[in-house]
């Protein structure tokens, strides 16, 4: 069908989009009440960001969702934002911004096609399977055209899928790779079965860490669904604020985000808390996908030895084994995850630069960076915790 029969529309709120139409592109399984493969591109997650004021207003993330229609039916869509800074992205372009502004002018505003504050790989150009081949180039061209028409410096599609990454170069986007750490479930029967796959030294270290973590004077409890109460969210908000202040200067998400997510996404939430006499003193919030657990936020008001490792990493592994999930994605960065069974995995992004001269300079930088990332992953493979150190087989 010719492109002329497909129209692009930009909307500034998901109130302008039907939930089932969006999820038919992003996560059709969610329409049927199942857990989505990717909970973060669903209508309800993106709408929670919007309704809670975590995006929009003075956040520096301004929604401009891009929609492709064919005969008034939604063919494809993408979570697109105009950004006035580079915070909350986890794919860093601050050096590009500084160089661009020294040489050519304003780097901001720019376009970001991403899930805000969420370094989780997945599809960014969303469409039903039968429409993906047609929707992908239409949306990509729509993103570039919107940037050009509005004289924006650049467009960035971050934490995209490998398939999108492969196709993006032919449409004028530069390719960028990075890495983060994922745990893979090799059909383990229980946590001990996982430990048995590790080298003796790593196995002993994990056992010691778990023993020390349990000596904080309380108990560790998992909550999900309707078990998560307002009291739990109050406590977790304190944890999240502490982490936000230390890492970013201020939290990215608002307090109401957690209340709305708890109401609208309860089936996809796992809250792990450390409690003393029933009072939470530390915790981690995870999102549950159809086949993966996503560790997202951690914080504490009291710091105990190894409690972070227990709550964020080992509890997540146990939960994944018990619920037969194939992997745990523990978020951005953190070489310390390697010794705890999380192996490096490639992440991908695509970048379009409006200025051709600057685009060539960035392309050269990215070529060098990809080689450096490849070397780093090779080195990390030599320090893997498993008896069999073949990283490629474990990935």
Regions found by a protein language model. Give the residues of each.
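N-acyltransferase acceptor-side catalytic subdomain
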Residues: 1-395
């Amino acid at each position: 069908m010719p492109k002329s029969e497909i129209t692009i529309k930009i909307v500034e709120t998901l109130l302008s989009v039907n939930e089932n139409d969006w999820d038919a592109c992003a996560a059709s399984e969610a329409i049927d009440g199942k857990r989505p493969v990717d909970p973060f591109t669903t209508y309800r997650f993106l709408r929670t960001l919007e309704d809670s004021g975590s995006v929009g207003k003075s956040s520096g993330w301004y929604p401009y969702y891009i929609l492709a229609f064919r005969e008034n039916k939604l063919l494809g869509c993408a979570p697109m934002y105009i950004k006035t800074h580079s915070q909350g992205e986890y794919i860093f372009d601050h050096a590009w911004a500084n160089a661009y502004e020294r040489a050519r002018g304003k780097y901001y505003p720019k376009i970001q096609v991403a899930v805000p504050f969420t370094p989780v790989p997945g599809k960014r150009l969303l469409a039903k399977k039968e429409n993906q081949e047609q929707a992908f180039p239409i949306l990509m061209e729509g993103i570039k055209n919107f940037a050009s028409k509005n004289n924006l410096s650049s467009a960035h599609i971050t934490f995209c899928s490998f398939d999108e990454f492969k196709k993006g170069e032919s449409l004028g986007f530069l390719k960028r790779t990075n890495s983060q750490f994922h745990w893979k479930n090799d059909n383990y029967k229980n946590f001990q079965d996982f430990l048995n796959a590790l080298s003796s030294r790593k196995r002993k270290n994990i056992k010691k860490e778990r023993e020390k973590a349990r000596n904080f004077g309380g108990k560790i409890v998992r909550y999900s669904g309707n078990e998560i109460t307002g009291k739990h969210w109050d406590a977790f908000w304190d944890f999240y604020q502490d982490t936000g202040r230390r890492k970013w200067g201020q939290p990215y998400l608002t307090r109401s985000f957690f209340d709305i997510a708890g109401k609208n996404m309860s089936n996809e939430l796992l809250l792990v808390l450390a409690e003393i006499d029933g009072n939470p003193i530390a915790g981690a919030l995870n999102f549950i996908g159809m086949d993966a657990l996503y560790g997202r936020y951690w914080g504490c008001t009291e710091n105990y030895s190894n409690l972070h490792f227990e709550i964020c990493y080992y509890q997540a592994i146990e939960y994944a084994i018990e619920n037969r999930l194939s992997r745990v994605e523990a978020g951005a960065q953190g070489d310390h995850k390697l010794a705890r069974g999380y192996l490096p995995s490639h992440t991908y992004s695509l970048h379009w630069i409006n200025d051709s001269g600057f685009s060539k300079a960035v392309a050269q930088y990215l070529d060098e960076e990809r080689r450096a990332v490849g070397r780093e992953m090779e080195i990390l493979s030599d320090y893997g915790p498993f008896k069999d150190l073949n990283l490629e087989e474990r990935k």
